[in-house]
Amino acid sequence: MKQVLKVAVSFLMLWAAVLHAEVRIEITQGVDSARPIGVVPFKWAGPGAAPEDVGAIVGADLRNSGKFNPIDANRMPQQPATASEVTPAAWTALGIDAVVVGQVQPSADGSYLVSYQLVDTSGNPGNVLAQNQFKVTKQWLRYAAHTASDEVFEKLSGIKGAFRTRIAYVVQTNGGQFPYELRVADYDGYNQFVVHRSPQPLMSPAWSADGSKLAYVTFESGRSALVIQTLANGAIRQVASFPRHNGAPSFSPDGSKLAFALSKSGSLNLYVMNLGSGQISPVTDGRSNNTEPTWFPDSQTLAYTSDQAGRPQVYKVNANGGAPQRVTWEGSQNQDSDVSADGKFLVTVSSNGGAQHISKLDLVTGAVQVLTDTFLDETPSIAPNGTMVIYSSKQGLGSVLQLVSTDGRFKARLPATDGQVKFPAWSPYL
């Protein structure tokens, strides 16, 4: 836990303003078909009320994954705090084969000891499948809960949890000196803070491979420019400000390169910068428009959008150049793709018959699945464990963030309370 906290502490920046108007997940579809589980309210072993409802956070995480459906506390046959207090038969009677129990205990030094146990109620009744404890200060209680959620999720699903990840996005507010804000929040919308404020548009945030930096597009100089901002100290480095368009940054998974699109020669084309030397090399060169690069896990191959066949479609090409290969064939156009961390699938904005939705393309079988049914969907970004996609869509007169599971069954919304929200980007594991 200490090592994890060292990584996460870089986000507690003195210069960042923590916001109260936060986005929160509202589930809209799919939790009823998920696996039932018991997450018992964690026992509070101190005076007064607990500073955080850790059990509720764990339950919300598991529910937000789309793979689990925690039962309501009023339906629980008992509320044990330890594995030894669990009566397995009482839970299996409700169709529940695993129960999470835990407690939070205050310490004399002002810290808190958070402990949990994951208990099997059917296969080997009473067996503890996973357990851990974390000593944290008050501000890290939510993080401790997310850590427990990650461990429970991985034990039960075999998939690494992503509840300690973050999302970056751009918020446009009405009026004020700085109506554009680049913000970062926990994956569930909590602990939101401002990374950068601007009087001019901000676009296309992209995370570095280690989660310590964000690249994005700014128009503060009067024209587009690409910058990289270090989250720990706020330092901003300009990496591209050529004539015409500079946009669509994407860090390679190995952290050594940044791909982006420039139109300095007329048409939009892809370029790659070596982040060590600063050298910029062209990837594509032609009269068609080539943009929106995203990396495959080998850090050598790019998926991107091109109109070389007339309408926008997704292609792939070696980052050192070479002949492009078309990837998408279904739908009148496909654009703004994101490749999963394992390289097995990509998601894209697909247009067909006037509709614009997020689709998933299985890169092994070629199967295509439309994941969303919202309006004018844009800019999908895949969670690092490949289970969820965050994207923006139109709702009323504004833009909001939406979540959909990569099997299409679970859907949720993160409604904004103080502006239009666009360009979501899911962080790597932190």
Curated annotation (Swiss-Prot):
Quaternary structure note: The Tol-Pal system is composed of five core proteins: the inner membrane proteins TolA, TolQ and TolR, the periplasmic protein TolB and the outer membrane protein Pal. They form a network linking the inner and outer membranes and the peptidoglycan layer.
Gene Ontology BP annotations: cell division; protein import
Family matches, as NCBIfam families: propeller_TolB (TIGR02800)
Cited HAMAP family: TolB (MF_00671)
Species in which this protein is naturally found: Pectobacterium atrosepticum (strain SCRI 1043 / ATCC BAA-672) (Erwinia carotovora subsp. atroseptica)
Its job: Part of the Tol-Pal system, which plays a role in outer membrane invagination during cell division and is important for maintaining outer membrane integrity. TolB occupies a key intermediary position in the Tol-Pal system because it communicates directly with both membrane-embedded components, Pal in the outer membrane and TolA in the inner membrane.
Keyword Signal applies: yes
Signal peptide positions (record): 1-21
Lineage: Bacteria, Pseudomonadati, Pseudomonadota, Gammaproteobacteria, Enterobacterales
Compartment annotation: Periplasm
Predominant localisation class: periplasm
UniProt cross-references to Pfam families, sorted A to Z: PD40, TolB_N
Entry GO terms, CC: periplasmic space
UniProt keywords, alphabetically: Cell cycle, Cell division, Periplasm, Signal
Full protein name: Tol-Pal system protein TolB
Assigned protein family: Belongs to the TolB family.
Domain of life: Bacteria
InterPro entries named among the record's database cross-references: 6-blade_b-propeller_TolB-like, PD40, Tol-Pal_TolB, TolB_N
